[in-house]
Amino acid sequence: MVQRSHRSLVLETGGIQDRNSAKPFQVRRLYCTPIFHAFSFPEMVVNTIRLGFPSFYMRRFDESFADKIHEFGITETMAAPAMLLKIIQWTEKHEEKRFKLQGLRTILCAGAALASRLRASFLQLFDSASVRIVQVWGMTEGGWFATFWYPEHDDTGSIGRPLPTCQIRVSEVSRAELPDGRQVGELLVKGPQLLTAYKGHPDATKEALHDGWLRTGDIGYCADGKIYIIDRAKDIIKVNGWTISPAELETVLHQIPGIVDAAALSYGTGTKEHVAMFVVAEGPSLLVADIKHHLLQQVARFKVATCEIHLVDSLPRSPSGKVLRSVLRHQLQAHYDNVDSGTS
């Protein structure tokens, strides 16, 4: 269990406060993300009361979302990327839902990497060009670390600028240089809002905190005062000595017509480690061969030459919208166990 002080929460909620008085619309929030999540809690519970803007809560995120936006005059909401995808799918089935979304002005987005194509597709739902998708980066161990404040728009793929209470840098231990000269590595965060300890686990606390710097496990870089995330360190795939980002592959997969959801992960160990992809298609017409052909046109051959692709009905996700890669890996192992035993 993560231990944080009262002071850390006070500093975080003050640091994430947006410039509501500068907005040319009344802030009216609809919340439908898990209240216990580090992304949701400081806004849903603390700032809602502290700042006093009208707030509405859905018991669960479902197809009535657009109806609630229209009914209660909602201007801002919070969502994970998977939720944005669902909203797009609902509007494709029911055109009136797109109309009911038009009052939205700001969508705070966190919980997983937001693919550029998904971001663009969601913004196309709106007649107004002033609608903003604002990414948020953080974790339970310290709440929010970075975001953008009104009225800044960003279309560079950044997850935000550091909060006033945060220092963010790239670890010197894991640092590497990209071809364009950018220094990339594990991102470290320091500030008074960080956890005090993992309760009952002093070794884990010592591993996570070094001289006050928290190891986030996220690989990224800093440029022009903005933070960019490449992928989670634990999710990085290594094939024959080459490093592959699942997020990069998933972004390309989401750009293929007919694909509504996708995930990439590593499978196997040592020399047998390779890329495994799971794809949710709109219909039966999409073939694995077509997906492989598209991938070979968009990314370096070594990244996908030995990959395996599986068409599935859905992807397992956590309440916050993150793909549960461990579940997919377990399902894949079970599949091969059945094949080896002759039961599949």
Curated annotation (Swiss-Prot):
GO terms for molecular function: ATP binding; CoA-ligase activity. The keyword ATP-binding applies. Its EC number is 6.2.1.-. It holds the Pfam family AMP-binding. InterPro entries: AMP-bd_C (IPR025110), AMP-bd_C_sf (IPR045851), AMP-dep_synth/lig_dom (IPR000873), ANL_N_sf (IPR042099). GO terms for biological process: secondary metabolic process. Residues 2-239, 248-322 are annotated as: AMP-binding. Keywords: ATP-binding, Ligase, Nucleotide-binding. It comes from the Eukaryota. Gene3D superfamilies: 3.30.300.30, N-terminal domain of ligase-like. Pathway: Secondary metabolite biosynthesis. Belongs to the ATP-dependent AMP-binding enzyme family. PANTHER family: ADENYLATE-FORMING ENZYME AFEA, LONG-CHAIN-FATTY-ACID--COA LIGASE. Acyl-CoA ligase; part of the gene cluster that mediates the biosynthesis of squalestatin S1 (SQS1, also known as zaragozic acid A), a heavily oxidized fungal polyketide that offers potent cholesterol lowering activity by targeting squalene synthase (SS). SQS1 is composed of a 2,8-dioxobicyclic[3.2.1]octane-3,4,5-tricarboxyclic acid core that is connected to two lipophilic polyketide arms. This is Acyl-CoA ligase clz12. It comes from Cochliobolus lunatus (Filamentous fungus).
